Amino acid sequence: MQQVEHLVDTLHLEDLRNDLHPSIFDDNDDYDMLIVRLPVIIEKLEAISLGFIITQDGSYLFNAAKNRLEDLESRFDGPHHKIDTLLDKLLKSFHSYQDQISDMEETLYDDTVQTNFMTQWLTLKRDILRIERIMHRTSAVMQDMIHYYETDESFPMNHYIDIHEHCERILRSATLQLSKLDYLYNFYNTRTNEKMNRLIFLLTIISAIFLPLNLIVGFFGMNTSGLPFTEGANGTLSVVTGLVLLVVTTSLGVHLWRRKIEYSE
């Protein structure tokens, strides 16, 4: 094991120790280095980097906790098993994102949107964008590895093609969910704007009704002589009756105007 570590370049060892290192395949004379970065969804989205050293005789997995290379059972099957296990878990756990987006879509159709809609939308957008970014790089690296070893008779081509297809499948799913999120965002904005327009329209109607009333009240509030209805016992009743008639007339006019607009649309 120590002999293998002596073969590995110092810079490559630093890459293996880097928990945030992106996926990469680097071929060398004495060994090849493969780093595969994959998303992991447990309670929240995380990402881990698996580092492998592949020699002519075997393969080794870098154990970050123990800071050393550990021998795998076979040259190609060992890395395949580690990567394939994480991909299977990712495929299953990714369904939770799809379910959340479907639920959000249903709430929009049923007009039962929760108050935390945008917070949930931003969280999903951030996580799925991160998954798409990671899987795009990982898929390309796996393709590079397949091309490099395709002439090696001991290389299990079908196994690694299967890994590449899983990467592409997750990538396509992430892209599809992102397009759905964009659609939901536009739909949500449309519904919100409609509600805002209705509110503004209602405020306009209220203003149209009460503005003439305010003018009339202000007129009769002037402390000047010669105001109408100041003489006689039924002056107040006459003013109230006039105000009621004005409200009814204005409301009827606004209603007819609104019906005309709706009919033209």
Residue spans for each PLM region:
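Hydrophobic alpha-helical transmembrane segments and their immediately adjacent juxtamembrane loops
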Residues: 168-169, 175-265
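Long amphipathic alpha-helical coiled-coil segments
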Residues: 146-157, 184-193
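Leucine-rich repeat
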Residues: 154, 158, 176-179
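Peripheral, non-transmembrane regulatory/ligand-interaction domains of membrane transport proteins
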Residues: 1-153, 162, 166-169, 173, ...
